[in-house]
């Protein structure tokens, strides 16, 4: 009986330690957020020439490539693997993008980052921060893409036609799954293979395979 209680206590302690943020987690998550925030800003600079032809092809389809703006949360969560990582990295990226200069305004950019990070965070939380495989990464990307699409529709496209709304949501979800989910997962594997993530579970997993 004593051994069972001790074992259970040890397991609980181990689980708590696994989910606790370290200094290195905060530093790396911040670096990811800043780096991706610069990418967000650059994407905003070229967004007009890119989104125009896509929207002309099918209005609402532009939400697909817009999913690049939800990459930070998924990428950060896949590397840090701690509660709040998706929200934190996406929010930092949004703040950096806003500080450099966002065409959508600072407050709306930061609000979007918070919403998009939450969309990814909820999926990882649903799996109790234990499953980091490709399907879950893509599902988290889809969640972030869905959050982005709904947020955009409420703020920028209120009263849009049903066809546009449906196209925008579907495009955002698919784009989020492929760009934020799939590409982030591949990026983490590449970084782990290069030895850049040796202090994280993602790097240790790759080393053990």
Predicted regions and their residues:
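Membrane interface segments of multi-pass transport proteins and intramembrane proteases
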Residues: 52-59, 128-132, 196
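Membrane-water interface at transmembrane helix exits
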Residues: 40, 44, 48, 77, ...
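Short helix-perturbing small/polar motifs within transmembrane alpha-helices
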Residues: 30-33, 111-153
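Membrane interfacial helix motifs at helix-loop boundaries and amphipathic/re-entrant anchors
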Residues: 38-65, 95-109, 148-171
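Alpha-helical membrane segments and adjacent membrane-interface helices in multi-pass membrane proteins
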Residues: 60-120
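Hydrophobic transmembrane alpha-helices
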Residues: 2-6, 11-76
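Alpha-helical transmembrane segments and their cytosolic interface
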Residues: 1-13, 19, 23-27, 39, ...
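Hydrophobic alpha-helical transmembrane segments
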Residues: 26-31, 67, 71, 83-91, ...
């Amino acid at each position: 009986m004593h051994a069972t209680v001790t074992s259970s206590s040890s397991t609980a302690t181990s689980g708590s330690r696994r989910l606790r943020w370290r200094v290195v987690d905060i530093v790396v998550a911040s670096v990811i957020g800043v780096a991706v925030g610069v990418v967000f800003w650059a994407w905003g600079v070229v967004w007009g020439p890119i989104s125009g032809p896509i929207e002309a092809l099918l209005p609402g389809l532009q939400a697909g490539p817009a999913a690049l703006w939800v990459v930070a949360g998924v990428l950060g969560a896949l590397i840090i693997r701690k509660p709040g990582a998706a929200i934190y990295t996406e929010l930092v990226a949004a703040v950096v993008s806003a500080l450099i200069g966002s065409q959508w305004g600072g407050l709306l950019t930061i609000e979007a980052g918070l919403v998009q990070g939450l969309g990814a965070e909820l999926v990882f939380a649903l799996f109790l921060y234990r499953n980091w495989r490709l399907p879950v990464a893509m599902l988290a990307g889809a969640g972030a893409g869905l959050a982005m699409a709904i947020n955009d529709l409420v703020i920028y496209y209120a009263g849009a036609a049903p066809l546009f709304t449906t196209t925008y949501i579907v495009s955002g979800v698919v784009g989020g799954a492929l760009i934020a989910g799939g590409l982030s997962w591949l990026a983490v594997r590449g970084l782990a293979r290069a030895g850049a993530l040796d202090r994280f579970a993602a790097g240790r997993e790759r080393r053990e395979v």
